[in-house]
Structures are given as structure tokens and as C-alpha cells.
Design a protein with these regions (language model features):
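Generic surface-pattern signal
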Residues: 13, 17-20, 24, 54, ...
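Helix-boundary capping/turn motifs
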Residues: 37-44, 57-62, 74
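Extended amphipathic alpha-helical scaffold segments
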Residues: 51-57
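Acidic, serine/threonine- and proline-rich intrinsically disordered low-complexity regions
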Residues: 1-51
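Predominantly eukaryotic Lys/Arg-rich, low-complexity intrinsically disordered regions
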Residues: 64-153
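Short, solvent-exposed segments of well-ordered alpha helices
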Residues: 29, 33-36, 57-60, 121, ...
């Protein structure tokens, strides 16, 4: 969990440094304002995760996935990091038969199937937010430190 905490801290610091290093003329642009708002939101939504990691309240499987994302992102293996994110977000659960053909009206009772069994970590709102912010950090890292095109993943 220490690796995950330090990766999050380092990514947020790098993002903040990247924003403050921008030209003053750029601060008026809408794109810059949007990115600054994304940074603030990410920092805010990641607080519960950082607190839970510090207090040891995060599930071992989630810590493993987050560590995998942090390691892959740190080594600029962004495709692997995104795959680890997808496994964390939706898991490896196969879709039920015919789920691609479900219409709006079929949904009424279908949501009760398997009720009670948590399918993936995104069922909790706070967890959903910080998992999405982890993906945002990977996207920032990919923009900030792009992979060398001569080295294929």
C-alpha cells in the first residue's frame, strides 16, 4: 500500500507542478481551467483512498490492483495499466447471455438478478470516484511522460 500511496502523491505533485509551470497567458484559456478543475477534483476524490490506505482499510485485492496500475504506469506501460484498471473497475466477470440485446423495457426486473452479490468495486459511490481518479492519474502520466514510439509495449 505504501507504493500506491507514494505513486498517487508523486502523480498529484507532478500534475500540480505541470500546471504551475504553464505560461501565465495560458491560465485564461478554457482548456487550462478545465484541467485545473480536473486536478482539484482528482485530489479531492483521492483523499478517501489515501486515508483508507493509511489506515489499512483497503481490501488486499484492490491494493494489489492499484499497485499493478502504479507499477505499470511508473514503467510507462500504459496499456497494461489501463488493463489493470479495467480489471479493478469491472473485473473479469463475463456478461450474461444476451445482455447485448437488452432493451430499455427489459431492465425492470433484470436488476434484481444476483442482487446482494457485489459484482465489482464500482458499486460504492466513494470507491467509484477514487477508482476513476486513479485512471485519470494514468492518463495524466501518459500525457506527461509519453512512451517512446520505437519501443512497442
Amino acid at each position: 500500500s505504501h507504493e500506491v500511496t507514494s505513486w498517487i502523491r508523486n502523480m498529484l505533485r507532478a500534475w500540480e507542478a505541470d500546471l504551475t509551470a504553464r505560461a501565465p497567458a495560458e491560465e485564461k484559456q478554457q482548456v487550462f481551467k478545465a484541467e485545473k478543475a480536473q486536478y482539484r477534483q482528482s485530489k479531492q476524490y483521492l483523499k478517501p483512498l489515501r486515508r483508507a490506505l493509511r489506515d489499512g482499510e483497503v481490501d488486499a485485492g484492490v491494493i494489489f490492483s492499484l499497485a499493478e496500475i502504479a507499477k505499470d504506469s511508473g514503467q510507462r506501460r500504459y496499456r497494461a495499466a489501463k488493463e489493470a484498471y479495467m480489471r479493478l473497475a469491472i473485473g473479469n466477470h463475463p456478461w450474461p447471455m444476451g445482455v447485448t440485446f437488452v432493451t430499455f423495457h427489459d431492465r425492470a426486473a433484470r436488476h434484481k438478478i444476483g442482487e446482494g452479490a457485489q459484482a465489482h468495486v464500482l458499486d460504492d459511490e466513494t470507491t467509484r470516484k477514487y477508482v476513476q481518479m486513479v485512471k485519470r492519474l494514468v492518463t495524466f502520466a501518459e500525457r506527461r511522460w509519453p512512451i517512446d514510439p520505437t519501443q512497442e509495449e
